[in-house]
Regions:
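Short acidic, Gly/Ser-rich segments with clustered Asp/Glu that frequently serve as metal-coordination loops
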Residues: 112-116
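Active/binding-pocket-proximal capping segment
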Residues: 123-127, 313-316
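Acidic two-metal-ion nuclease catalytic site recognized across multiple nuclease folds
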Residues: 304-322
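Extracellular low-complexity, Gly/Ser/Thr-rich intrinsically disordered linkers
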Residues: 30, 34, 39-46, 50-55, ...
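Mg2+-dependent endonuclease catalytic cores in nucleic-acid-processing enzymes, primarily RNase H-like
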Residues: 1-3, 13-14, 33, 63, ...
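Short cysteine/histidine-rich metal-coordination sites, predominantly Zn2+-binding motifs
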Residues: 2-27, 311-316
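A contiguous, basic/glycine-rich beta-loop/short-helix subdomain that forms a polymer-engagement track
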Residues: 13-108, 120
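Hydrophobic, well-ordered secondary-structure elements that form the walls
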Residues: 111, 158, 295
Length: 322
């Protein structure tokens, strides 16, 4: 094994040679890549720590840190291994025995439709394991609140999507103490920690929204909380959890066909970006309803915010210590 010493690192840098990896590239376009193992100002112990954190992230369902480690630290291409099909597969289920000894958090997530709501309740452990508790389609705001109380969920831990009928959602959040959420096309959001470090996460900092905007009471009532969540990142994580490629994620034994169908309501499609590189995006499958899928995405986001998963979804910007 090599020791992380200045003379050894310098010897590595002096003895290295550049290799052509794409002989078909135009002669007027030249690019270079090298591993962070080479520069003497990058400590190997930091690279080892980054790699171990990335491997730990895989155990709870996300490839984001490993992708950053391979592409940004090692300078090697990332190869997507996620399937793009929408074929229905049997979901993992639990024994429906309660109380669950490992439960640390319980969230309700709600998708708003014209005439009804989709509501999902899921229990989470601190290490990212989770169990579906309940799902249903309440008809009124009051029904949603009754279910929150029935399943013993704190008001601010009920997260409701505000993309549709936002003004009524804001009013309901003010009335009942709920929290708003909204999906975003962004892959991550900037956060500044108390120590001044800059990090990027799959959800935004809290945004305060005036529930009375556009009315005479605008600016005179207490604002409600809103969090944006990354559509691409969170859906990638949920996919991995659903496929058993992370922490334990289970449904009820009698979740039903509608729940199962909607959990396979979106799939990833590949397209080429302007540079000709493959980009993967989530798309709805035909006219298949995806409301439960969205509720489960908000569950993943809530788990990140509660730090059941958060540690492994934090990407420290290069040059920062965290």
């Amino acid at each position: 094994p090599f020791i992380d010493r200045q003379d050894i690192r310098n010897a590595f840098a002096r003895s290295g040679v550049w290799e052509v990896t794409n002989p078909q590239a135009p002669s007027e376009k030249v690019s270079f890549r090298w591993s962070a193992v080479l520069p003497p100002w990058v400590a190997w112990r930091d690279l080892v720590q980054e790699f171990l954190q990335a491997k730990a992230a895989l155990r709870v369902g996300t490839t984001v840190p490993l992708k950053a480690f391979k592409c940004e630290s090692l300078g090697v291409p990332w190869i997507e291994e996620m399937e793009t099909d929408d074929e229905l597969r049997e979901l993992s289920v639990h024994d429906d025995a309660w109380p669950w000894p490992d439960e640390d958090f319980r969230f309700a997530t709600v998708d708003v439709q014209k005439d009804l709501f989709y509501l999902v309740v899921r229990a989470w452990s601190k290490d990212g394991n989770s169990r579906l508790v309940h799902w249903s389609k309440p008809l009124t705001w009051e029904d949603v609140e009754e279910l929150r109380i029935e399943y013993n969920i704190k008001p601010h831990l009920l997260f409701i999507d505000s993309a549709y009928n936002a003004q009524k959602v804001y009013a309901a959040c003010k009335r009942f103490g709920w929290t708003c959420m909204r999906g975003s096309k962004l892959r991550d959001f900037a956060h500044k920690l108390k120590d001044g470090a800059n990090v990027r996460r799959a959800y935004s900092p809290r945004v305060l929204v005036d529930p009375a905007i556009g009315t005479k009471a605008q600016g005179r009532v207490r604002p409600v909380s809103l969090f944006h969540w990354s559509n691409p990142t969170v859906k990638d994580v949920l996919y991995n959890l659903r496929e058993g490629k992370g922490a334990s994620w289970t449904a009820l034994p009698d979740s039903g066909q509608e729940y199962e169908l909607q959990m396979f309501s979106e799939r990833r499609k590949e397209r080429a970006d302007k540079a000709g590189q493959p980009v993967y995006e989530w798309h709805r499958v035909g006219k298949r309803a995806n409301h439960i899928w969205d509720c489960e995405c908000m569950q993943v986001t809530a788990a990140m915010m509660a730090r059941c998963l958060e540690t492994f979804f934090t990407i420290v910007e290069k040059g920062q210590k965290h």
